[in-house]
Amino acid sequence: MAQSYVGQKRIRRYYGKIREVLEMPNLIEVQKSSYDLFLKSGDGPKAADGEGIQGVFQSVFPIKDFNETAVLEFVKYELEKPKYDVDECQQRDMTYAAPLKVTLRLIVFDVDETTGARSVKDIKEQDVYMGDMPLMTANGTFIVNGTERVIVSQMHRSPGVFFDHDKGKTHSSGKLLFACRIIPYRGSWLDFEFDAKDIVFARIDRRRKLPVTTLLYALGMDQEGIMDAYYETVNFKHQKNRGWVTRFFPERVRGTRPTYDLVDAATGEVILKAGEKATPRMVKKWIDEAQITELLVPFDHIVGRYVAQDIINEETGEIWVEAGDELTMEYDRDGEVKGGTLKLLLDQGITDIPVLDIDNVNVGPYIRNTMAADKNMGRDTALMDIYRVMRPGEPPTVEAASNLFDTLFFDSERYDLSAVGRVKMNMRLDLGKPDTQRTLDRDDIIACIKALTELRDGKGEIDDIDHLGNRRVRSVGELMENQYRVGLLRMERAIKERMSSVEIDTIMPQDLINAKPAAAAVREFFGSSQLSQFMDQTNPLSEVTHKRRLSALGPGGLTRERAGFEVRDVHPTHYGRMCPIETPEGQNIGLINSLATFARVNKYGFIETPYRKVVEGAVTDDVVYMSATEEMRHTVAQANAQLDEEGRFVSDLISSRKAGEFMLNPPDAIDLIDVSPKQLVSVAASLIPFLENDDANRALMGSNMQRQAVPLLQSDAPFVGTGIEAVVARDSGAAIMARRAGVIDQVDATRIVVRATEMLEPGEPGVDIYRLRKFKRSNQSSCINQRPLVKVGDVVHRGEVVADGPCTDMGELALGRNVIVAFMPWNGYNYEDSILISERILRDDVYTSIHIEEYEVAARDTKLGPEEITRDIPNVGEEALRNLDEAGIVYIGAEVQPGDILVGKITPKGESPMTPEEKLLRAIFGEKASDVRDTSLRLPPGAYGTIVEVRVFNRHGVDKDERALQIEREEVERLARDRDDELAILERNIYSRLRTLIMGKTAVKGPKGIRAGSEINEDLLSTLSRGQWWQLALGEEADAKEVEALHEQFEAQKRALDHRFEDKVEKVRRGDDLPPGVMKMVKVFVAVKRKLQPGDKMAGRHGNKGVISKVVPIEDMPFLADGTHVDLVLNPLGVPSRMNVGQILETHMGWAARGLGIKIDEALQDYRRSGDLTPVKEAMRLAYGDETYEGAFGDREDEDLVEMAGRVTKGVPIATPVFDGAKEPDVNDALRRAGFDQSGQSIVFDGRTGEQFARPVTVGVKYMLKLHHLVDDKLHARSTGPYSLVTQQPLGGKAQFGGQRLGEMEVWALEAYGAAYTLQEMLTVKSDDVAGRTKMYESIVKGEDNFEAGVPESFNVLVKEVRGLGLNMELLDADEE
């Protein structure tokens, strides 16, 4: 049987000890699920949930006109098929999008003039086109105007209520001023805050502050209601000459020394003398035994307390004291009572006074003091006050003020807490509101103020805004939803105006709607939002990381300048949710993060991480996902805690964490355990082997630099990996996976044809054609190229790799190459992290990469006439046109240099008046060349290479040139070949099924020459053509029906195939949608091979970066005793200070891997000589260890084993997962098995002298990457070029073809050396002395050497500047005195 491809994969020796319970989730799930939810919200039963497109339409519609005689309702929406597929959009610079059709219903009412009753007069329904909705590609990106873009997820503060204080910064005394803020998803912010005098204020939208009682009055509360909401009431009963009887609070006395005797009101005995301490034991006795409930307190004890309710004269209705008034006694000079509210009440015979329970220790008088300071007393004045703050300068009326206040927080159109906000608010304030209530209500506001005053009283904690329970992720779907809502709201205004201005009876919904604002909002979001980014496509890892990025910047987020240290810092809740390592260096550090490997985003937008459940000290395989808030309640053990066979903890105390603190706990106190040791880092960091031995700063650089690795000509998976390389390659979409199981039918460089053997859906064709991308340009100009891995006849299973992409090798991520390195100094060439390389690297194309640049030219229709793409260019010699075809477009395969013409183009220029002679010549010869100028596309300076692809686009109705027709023919041929192959496989498939169906059956009738009733066998079928098989009618009805069904299926699939083909051909032949005014466009792709050269940047995976200093001949490089030459020489001093020791362990491990590979190679040579497989088996067992060997190779066929051994002769790949990988003993063991010294050092000889170096040197195999900072892209030189208009100095920078700046410090240097003439030259003729530089250029051309320096233009600019200030400067010659 044909070897299944699975058996050929390279097997890694896995060093991890901890069993993986959970598969790593799809790495770009964040993007996909979010956008799917947005687009498909209308499908299925959950449509009314208010999210996605459905939710947006439901929130904006129905739209009523101003006098409510008509209403426009939303019925449903539907996304149609996109016009072009992904590839076509990329080629044609279009946006990959689907038309959005919305069904709207217009209802017109009849309104009865007299009664005002409404009756339905007319209902019209119609589908309306609402612009295009961009679609996400299979890899989680968007194609916008032909380029791939990614929408980055944003971290923002979760809606809800937050409590905080100013850390004592506001007031000079350092007093903590508490504040509370209600943040909605959209709408006005509401703040409550204390000032230094302990009065509570409210602010709306950060405006001027109002006393909080004003807000409470506006909510319809009165003074008594406010007091009742915030304070308990205590009654004081007056007993003549004895004092007051009041309730006893034993808890408040505990541990204090009262200033008065405590007297039990019931018995009259003194239970505690003044100044004595109340011990807890006494308090317990009073509660339990004596059961004292009331105390008798001295008379003056009530003075200074506040009345809880209005106390009214029942007969006259006169209010004696109002709620919140202070009880006072006023004395005259002699100490006689002369007034005060308390005297007034006692005089009126009131002995029972309800008082607010404010003791200034446990409960403070903040709300009561605020009320006293507030000049408003009722709802109307409070509303007017709020109106004045919100709309300063407008005259307030009660009605307007009331409307404004209602719309601020209680109108679902203007204010939305969102489900998250409501859930967070319920949790923080212990409310039980349903999460469908998205606006505020009175209880919410009262509860917030209550919680704030309790904070001031010392109860409760403030919130930590950097806690991941208070920050949430907004992914693509949600960002898009908000943007679309903005567009629809803009549209709504226009619809309302139009509804009231037209004759509503006669029009359809289509006429009311102008979808431009909605479409524009979407386009603006994808084109220019801060979160819509040009995809980083350098390699597959950079793509995956870009899609998993979390940014705190962007609209509605932070700004770099304002973000403090706290926001950027690593927080305990980041564990398993956001990577603590991977973040940019520079001003964005900590603001842009990466999602951890196992993390996912829940429906509320909080990041969750998985844990295994622990039940009574035993670890189970149940996995639960937890958000940061839920995790606070649990005790979590680390993944590397030691377990026995049954999954119980081995030690008595286990390192664990709870609520952000680390502690040691006994096994039975533990609820959860981490799923995997790598769950706390991101994808890029988990690709670094021996990460645990690296310093964090260097690990950060390592993670970031892996994303800049350039795809090389030959990829090479690392010997020392971490085991997740295959996952990254799979999820990035770089490698091609089989969609379903099948057998390989055809393979060539551009496509793989698979005959499917499993059906995923009935009726789909039994053929999969995988088109490979060949030498396509990525966003970063690196090369995307896919290569098949399978042979004809191979059996593939679903989800298996059939082709490698850029930076992948056998389906594993391969960013660099394994090279032999030595850590030693070499003549100072590796000073300061420089790298010395061997010429072998250039000779064998080890680090050679292909870069593809795209150049385009458009022929427009100008005022003076159309531009033309042609070979006929004025004043250009035949030599310059050697690479162009008759249409004026460069050939594929031409080698081009800077300045070469790629596409010839001429532009008409303005007519100049002609002399009579010219007119005569023009009339005789029809000479036209004089009135056009050459505007051809030329290769810019510094670029060179080979033309690999040319595309020509024509406008509708413009005749195609020969080149365009040729490209079109090739494209149609390719499509036809695809169709024919698919048809051939389909026929083979169907006819083989038909044969098995009819074989051995009896034919009732058939084509000519077949007798009725004859048995169908091979001989009979061979006399007929395959098409005639269908004409054999079978006797059994069931069989006949089956044949008929098969025929139907065959015909249907054939029709579908033809239809698809016709459709594609029609698209190819149709003209292209070009921008207005463009008649024709040509794109030319130039590829260049870049070898490694001095000045290029390289790096390892541990943050060890360096620049190449020199290329040394192979024979001069240091070599080992067996004659192996070293490829790279690195500086050993780069290791100790940087503390990234992981690279040394990697070097040793790689050396062992190579050694074991050599042993396998020798065993294979033995086998080829002797035919005995034993040495190969032994070598494989030595390399992989018994366990892996038995599992992977134990039951293999011999030729399989030989093939698999042949794949690892260069080095045996190993996997050492982060935080759970090989330790030092494992490295020693690997070196020993490979037959090397356990020190990892070797005797090395000098290549130039052949002498041995003084001491052994660390030599090993290391995985090194070539980064995207190539010297070819940076080096640039200018002789003459463009000048700045004002100063006439040369421009700066490579892009402008600028010069080198000679700044003031350089001038000082030349002055210091007294180089007067050099200095004069630099400041005049080489810069901005216009006349001088022209003369100098002339004299150089003539070969003379005289020039004179004049006045620099910048001096004239200075003079003009001074004159602009009103000072006239005149310059006099020295001669003129």
From Swiss-Prot:
**Which Gene3D superfamilies does the UniProt record give?**
2.40.50.100, 2.40.50.150, 3.90.1100.10, DNA-directed RNA polymerase, beta subunit, external 1 domain (2.30.150.10), DNA-directed RNA polymerase, subunit 2, domain 6 (2.40.270.10), RNA polymerase alpha subunit dimerisation domain (3.90.1800.10), RNA polymerase Rpb2, domain 2 (3.90.1110.10)
| Function per UniProt | DNA-dependent RNA polymerase catalyzes the transcription of DNA into RNA using the four ribonucleoside triphosphates as substrates.
**HAMAP family, A to Z:** RNApol_bact_RpoB
Q: How does it assemble?
A: The RNAP catalytic core consists of 2 alpha, 1 beta, 1 beta' and 1 omega subunit. When a sigma factor is associated with the core the holoenzyme is formed, which can initiate transcription.
Q: What class of enzyme is it?
A: transferase
Which chain regions cross the lipid bilayer?
Answer: none
Q: Name one GO molecular function term.
A: DNA-directed RNA polymerase activity
Asked if Transport is a keyword of the record, the answer is no
Q: Which family does it belong to?
A: Belongs to the RNA polymerase beta chain family.
What is the protein's name according to its record? DNA-directed RNA polymerase subunit beta
Question: Which keywords does the record carry?
Answer: DNA-directed RNA polymerase, Nucleotidyltransferase, Transcription, Transferase
Coiled-coil features, chain-numbered ranges? none
Per the record, GO CC terms?
DNA-directed RNA polymerase complex
EC numbers, comma separated? 2.7.7.6
Q: Which GO terms describe its biological process?
A: DNA-templated transcription
Q: Which organism is it from?
A: Cereibacter sphaeroides (strain ATCC 17023 / DSM 158 / JCM 6121 / CCUG 31486 / LMG 2827 / NBRC 12203 / NCIMB 8253 / ATH 2.4.1.) (Rhodobacter sphaeroides)
- Catalytic activity field: RNA(n) + a ribonucleoside 5'-triphosphate = RNA(n+1) + diphosphate
